[in-house]
Structure formats: C-alpha cells, structure tokens
From Swiss-Prot:
Belongs to the paramyxoviruses V protein family. The keyword Transmembrane helix does not apply. The gene is P/V/C. Residues 7-20, 99-110, 150-168, 175-193 have a biased composition (Basic and acidic residues). This is Protein V. One of its GO terms (molecular function) is metal ion binding. GO terms for biological process: symbiont-mediated suppression of host cytoplasmic pattern recognition receptor signaling pathway via inhibition of IRF3 activity; symbiont-mediated suppression of host cytoplasmic pattern recognition receptor signaling pathway via inhibition of MDA-5 activity. The lineage of its organism: Viruses, Riboviria, Orthornavirae, Negarnaviricota, Haploviricotina. It comes from Sendai virus (strain Ohita) (SeV). The modification Phosphoserine is found at residues 249, 257, 260.
Length: 369
C-alpha cells in the first residue's frame, strides 16, 4: 500500500515538472512577443516606472503589468528565475522567506535590465528630457599623466556645452568634423608626393627628399655621349675608355647658357669608325703579314715569294729577316734588317732602302750593311 502511494506521488511530481516546463517555455515566448510588440521608449520620456519594486510573488506562468506616467502598459514576465520556482514546487510548497528572496531576485534583475537600457538605480537621477546626451561620460582623471590631444579636448568641450553646437548651426557655420585629419590641398599634395598627383592616402616620406636633382648641360652631354658610344653588339667592347666630364655643379655666378660643349678628341688617319658609331680603334701596324705583298711590290720575274723567313715587326717600315742553314758542319743563322720597300726572294739578300725613310730609323740600313 505504501509502495502504491509512493509511485502515485512520484507520477504526480513528474507530471507537475512536465507541466511546469511547458509553462516556462510558453512564458518565454510570451515575454519575447511582448518585447517585440512594444513601442520603443522615447529618450525624453519618463522611465521612472522601470524602478518600481515588485513586492508580490507571481506564479511562474503568470505575467504582471507595470504602468508608468504617460506610458502604456508594458507586459513583463516573471520567468527570470524559473529554476528557483521549480525547486520550491518540488520541495512541497513555498514559505514566506523564500517568497521574499524570490521577489528580491526579480527586483535585481529588473534593475539590471533598466541599467543596461541607460537608466540608473536611483529613482530619477538624470534629466533625460533636456536634450543632453546621457551616454557621454564625465572627464576621466588623467592617471597616466599623458598629454591629451586637441580633438579630445574639443569633444569634451562640446559635450560640456551642447548649446555651442546649436549656436553654430543657427548662425550657419559649418560643423567641424571631429577625430579626422584635414584633407590636404591639391597643390600641396602634388608637391609632397613628388609629382605623383593628389594621393591623400600616401604620406610624403622625408627620406626621398634630395634624391632628384636638376640635370645640368654637362650631365645631358655625358648621357648623350654614352648612348652614342654604346656598342650595338654586347660581345664587342670598346678599346678606348669613355671620358665622362665632371658632374660637379657650376658655381652660382656662372651662366650655364654660355658653356661650350665638350670638345671631341682629334681624329687621326689611323682611326676608323664604322657606320654604327662604334668606338674608334687605332691600327698599330699597316704592314701586311709575313709572306704577302701588295700587287705592285710583287716580283715581275715570276719567282714566288719566300715563305720561310721570319720577320720582326717591332718597328714601323722594317722587317727583321734571318735565315738558318748548314755550312761545313755548322748551323749558321744570319739576320739583317730589310726595309719594307725591298723585295723578298727565294734566296734572301741584302738590299738598300729606296723609300728614303728607313735609314733615319734603322741603324743597319743607315750604316749600309
């Protein structure tokens, strides 16, 4: 019999808990509907009704209405503490101290919700109807000792004197833009950005200053000469060094317009230039290679030129000829200076110079050897 009573009691408690859960869910849905359907509260209106203390305990599924001055009824729900209500039902009933504690919890939650909406815990601590912004905090103490910027000081001044902004608007003065840097002027932007146009987003770097210089006529001439003397093929290199004029700036009292262009070095007959403006190459010796002669100097008797004698081309206009042969069991090496104007035969012989220039240079020719 006791077991049947215990089972029936447990079943009734389970049913009450299930019904309590359904009621709490319906209460939450009803509270959300009431909040969404209510009109937004005017900033200048009286919201002292938010601070009324709730002294009566309500059922978990019931709702109470609080009516303020000049406002409609706002439906709120007492499901903020469903857990404590369910625990009180399970324990078997509610006592008077528990009811008072529940009322205090609901009161604290309502006060916290009102504080989050911009109100304080006092009855009416601030005048919300005079047009001032209650969200602006007072001037906090400068604990770190850091200097404050001018924009912050202006913002605090405008917050302390809200009538100043209204006076500026009434007089037609433009309202200053707070917390923003002034836009750069178009001409200043071009000068600061080194000719890159108006780009307020790219600040001017002081490290770039002084890199660009005004080209002088000397620099222009040097660039032109370098471009002209640059070889067409990368494989061919210049044999003569390129002389670059000094790039030092002229004195301030000197006029660049009267400066004469740099003089070119005098060309000689031994220098030849090709049509592609390649550097001039000096020919050291015009003498043909060994064993070859020009057409007029070749012998008319039909003898071929001598291919064996070695020559010494150390001096212009002369050949050092020598022959090696065997005589009486000895190796004989004979050498002599033969001028360019002489003919080379199979059997070399000493000939006199007929160009009248060799004796002035060669001692052997001058002595008549």
């Amino acid at each position: 019999m006791d077991q049947d009573a215990l089972i029936s009691k447990e079943d009734s408690e389970v049913e009450r808990e299930a019904s309590g859960g359904r009621e709490s869910l319906s209460d939450v849905i009803g509270f959300l509907d009431a909040v969404l359907s209510s009109e937004p509260t005017d900033i200048g209106g009286d919201r002292s009704w938010l601070h009324n203390t709730i002294n009566t305990l309500q059922r978990p599924g019931s709702t109470h209405r609080v009516k303020g001055e000049g406002e409609g009824e706002v439906s709120t729900s007492s499901t903020q503490d469903n857990r404590s209500g369910e625990e009180s039902r399970v324990s078997g009933g509610t006592s008077e101290p528990e009811a008072e504690a529940h009322a205090r919890n609901v009161d604290k939650q309502n006060i916290h919700w009102a504080t989050g909406r911009g109100a304080s815990t006092d009855s009416v601590p601030q005048d919300l109807g005079n047009g001032r912004d209650s969200g602006i905090l007072e001037d906090p103490p400068n604990e770190g000792g850091y200097p404050r910027s001018g924009a912050e000081d202006e913002n605090r001044e405008m917050a302390a004197n809200p009538d100043k902004r209204g006076e500026d608007q009434a007089e037609g003065l433009p309202e200053e833009i707070r917390r923003s840097a002034p836009l750069p002027d178009e001409r200043e932007g071009r000068a600061d950005n080194n000719g890159r146009g108006v780009e307020p987003g790219s600040p001017h770097s002081a490290r770039v200053t002084g890199v660009l210089v005004i080209p002088s006529p000397e620099l222009e001439e040097a660039v032109l000469q370098r471009n002209k003397r640059r070889p067409a093929n990368s494989g061919s290199r210049s044999l003569t060094p390129v002389v670059v004029p000094s790039t030092r700036s002229p004195p301030p009292d000197h006029d660049n317009s009267t400066r004469s262009p740099p003089r070119k070095p005098p060309t000689t007959q031994d220098e030849h230039t090709n049509p592609r403006n390649t550097p001039a190459v000096r020919i050291k010796d015009r003498r043909p290679p060994t064993g070859t002669r020009s057409a007029p100097d070749r012998p008319t008797d039909g003898y071929p030129t001598h291919p064996s004698p070695e020559t010494d081309a150390t001096k212009k206009g002369h050949r050092r000829e020598h022959i090696i042969y065997e005589r009486d069991g000895y190796i004989v090496n004979e050498s002599w200076c033969n001028p360019v104007c002489s003919r080379i035969r199979v059997v070399p012989r000493r000939e006199l110079c007929v160009c009248k220039a060799c004796p002035k240079i060669c001692k052997l020719c001058r002595d008549g050897i």
